[in-house]
Amino acid sequence: MTNIRKTHPLLKIINSSFVDLPAPSSLSSWWNFGSLLGVCLAVQILTGLFLAMHYTSDTATAFNSVTHICRDVNYGWLLRYLHANGASMFFICLYLHVGRGLYYGSYTYSETWNIGILLLFAVMATAFMGYVLP
């Protein structure tokens, strides 16, 4: 008797996409960090955009605007903490993503590896200019 998931027309499509997915055996949880980087980047952009709506960079009122965000804006404290901890999570995922590439020998694909290193340096320079210097 054949399995219904392999004979039914609709279930056959779902089975071939999710259950019997043709994936290499070396695919492990280390391969999730690329998509986690995308999620962290989206969270950083969205929370940064919403925080920038209420922040003033004037030296006399900057601290007051941060307290305004935390106290008066709906879930402003959550936006601030998501943005701060999201940056740390972004760099953790970034370093683990590069570490996975080193472990599996992705540096042999020189063009892809060099583009990734340029992106890594661009992210580090952006973080330095935006978070460390001010």
Curated annotation (Swiss-Prot):
Binds 2 heme b groups non-covalently. One of its GO terms (molecular function) is metal ion binding. The chain crosses the membrane at residues 33-53, 77-98, 113-133. Keywords: Electron transport, Heme, Iron, Membrane, Metal-binding, Mitochondrion, Mitochondrion inner membrane, Respiratory chain, Transmembrane, Transmembrane helix, Transport, Ubiquinone. Its cofactor is heme b. Pfam families: Cytochrome_B. One of its GO terms (cellular component) is mitochondrial inner membrane. Heme b b562 binds at H83. The keyword Heme applies. Component of the ubiquinol-cytochrome c reductase complex (complex III or cytochrome b-c1 complex) that is part of the mitochondrial respiratory chain. The b-c1 complex mediates electron transfer from ubiquinol to cytochrome c. Contributes to the generation of a proton gradient across the mitochondrial membrane that is then used for ATP synthesis. The cytochrome bc1 complex contains 11 subunits: 3 respiratory subunits (MT-CYB, CYC1 and UQCRFS1), 2 core proteins (UQCRC1 and UQCRC2) and 6 low-molecular weight proteins (UQCRH/QCR6, UQCRB/QCR7, UQCRQ/QCR8, UQCR10/QCR9, UQCR11/QCR10 and a cleavage product of UQCRFS1). This cytochrome bc1 complex then forms a dimer. Belongs to the cytochrome b family. This is Cytochrome b. The lineage of its organism: Eukaryota, Metazoa, Chordata, Craniata, Vertebrata.
